[in-house]
Amino acid sequence: MTGKLAEKLPVTMSSLLNQLPDNLYPEEIPSALNLFSGSSDSVAHYNQMATENVMDIGLTNEKPNPELSYSSSFQPAPGNKTVTYLGKFAFDSPSNWCQDNIISLMSAGILGVPPASGALSTQTSTASMVQPPQGDVEAMYPALPPYSNCGDLYSEPVSFHDPQGNPGLAYSPQDYQSAKPALDSNLFPMIPDYNLYHHPNDMGSIPEHKPFQGMDPIRVNPPPITPLETIKAFKDKQIHPGFGSLPQPPLTLKPIRPRKYPNRPSKTPLHERPHACPAEGCDRRFSRSDELTRHLRIHTGHKPFQCRICMRSFSRSDHLTTHIRTHTGEKPFACEFCGRKFARSDERKRHAKIHLKQKEKKSEKGGAPSASSAPTVSLAPVVTTCA
């Protein structure tokens, strides 16, 4: 069955229904559609309704005077009598009187045609008749009990329906915890202690949590430990002034692999290298304090220079500089012989040795043929004669 929307018609509901002929529907109603087969009085009553204006029937089943117009507000009749109309429209195929298959009698009002004031008041009163009383709705659907908190909402196990027919999985209300109590007036009651400047031997005495309090600026931003202060701490056992009365724990220096040439003489004399490495088993000495600082990072494992691209850390700034070139692709060092570029100077130096070896080989090959091509002096045989 198909339905189409009708075009906008400048007519009202009552005028649309008045144009329908009286003999539109036959008196014989099929048994499938006959709702009142047992009572002839009821059928006669509805047959009488077919010849009258549907919109002109009041609540008391009395025909009003046609000259009277509908008022803006519909007054209910005494006795609280209501009339309920039941009907069914079924179209198997397009009929002769309705080629467009208009199946809704309310199409004149739905399509947006402004109805007359009388028709508007009639539709409003009809809608109020269809709505059930509020008392019947409350009797059919009882009010929900009030809940004091969210925990009372799940007082019974919650089950989920399975469309395949399996029994539902029940969840006990213990799985759903009640609402958490509100926080007290203290915004940060407990915070963990993430102190990164304690020695591993003192970790047992540090509590896991402590009440929120003002942080010491020295703990937040500890002063940097210079290599000279580190050496003094090893030699003189002095206490660092920035940490108050707490003794400064000894700096753990990791052993490193032995030097390849431990007894190799240095170009700088010994008296010009006053800064010795304090690590046990390390005999390195340096002429400048920054060189000792850089060397101590090998023992401590401190890597303060971090790449912002891959977050890799380095102990020396020059190592970070050459590492960043791997990301940027910069190659500032060019070979003097072939023009090939490198990111590190030691790579260029290693590459230059190849050209030097090739040059030496060419010079050796060039000197060998010159020696062989030298003229050979042949001595003539000496002939002696006897007199």
UniProtKB/Swiss-Prot annotation:
Keyword Metal-binding: yes
Ranges of compositional bias, category Basic and acidic residues: 269-283
Principal localisation: nucleus
Span list, region Disordered: 241-283, 348-387
Zn-finger segments (C2H2-type): 275-299, 305-327, 333-355
Keywords from the UniProt entry: DNA-binding, Metal-binding, Nucleus, Repeat, Transcription, Transcription regulation, Zinc, Zinc-finger
InterPro entries in alphabetical order: EGR_N, Znf_C2H2_sf, Znf_C2H2_type
Ranges of compositional bias, category Basic residues: 350-360
Family annotation (Pfam families): DUF3446, zf-C2H2
Keyword Transcription regulation: yes
SUPFAM superfamilies tied to this protein: beta-beta-alpha zinc fingers
One example of a Gene Ontology biological process annotation: positive regulation of transcription by RNA polymerase II
Compartmental location: Nucleus
GO molecular-function terms, A-Z: DNA-binding transcription activator activity, RNA polymerase II-specific; sequence-specific DNA binding; sequence-specific double-stranded DNA binding; zinc ion binding
GO cellular component, one term: synapse
PANTHER family, per the entry: EARLY GROWTH RESPONSE PROTEIN 3, KRUEPPEL-LIKE TRANSCRIPTION FACTOR
Function: Probable transcription factor involved in muscle spindle development.
Family, as annotated: Belongs to the EGR C2H2-type zinc-finger protein family.
Name of protein: Early growth response protein 3
Originating species: Mus musculus
Lineage: Eukaryota, Metazoa, Chordata, Craniata, Vertebrata
Gene that encodes it: Egr3
